[in-house]
Amino acid sequence: MFSKREWAILIGLVVLVLVVYAGLLLVMTRGGIGAGAVASQPTPPWEVLTAQEAYPLAEEVARAWQPDAKLSIASSSWRSGATPQELLEGKTTWGFHFISPSASQSCIVSVVGGEARVIESGSIPKVPVLLELSDWQVDSPQALSIFLDHGGRDFLAAHADADVHLHLLTRIENETLIWLAIGLSSKDGVAHTVPINAVTGAVVEIQS
């Protein structure tokens, strides 16, 4: 269970992730960054994958970037107007944030249309301790189903403009792999957040 202080830290991390993911979407929309030729993107509708389907593609690219690359965060979003059925499929484009402990570097790997590539990399001042993914059992469709069943469906019905953000967090201070599912209404400035144990599927409680 999270204390209120730990919960505040998590929310701060998610705000950072949202900024990174917004940058990821901008890069994907503009076709990439960096020197040299930029690979063309598939023409929609492209193949969309769940988190566990997309991860092996991202991991292969990340390990080519740095052999000891480990996943820090996996992120994706569904824009307002997505139906519950679309959410329950749990399939979309993904951004995976990897960290190389030996090189003190991080990179973002995008997976779009079944294609993975590094879109950004750089140094980091501090290397966090990350959990292994061997116990990762709950895929994105299950995480979104849990979100909908724990207030998410009612929240989206009340806030038609809300986007849904889904983040897999692997930092050891969380004690286990955590899915953070967030419905966010920019119009009303409100959010509905459901933290989910990505190993057991249980909703994580917050201690008072």
Tell me what each language-model feature is:
Residues F2-S208:
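Long, terminal "pre-/pro-" and other extracytoplasmic accessory regions
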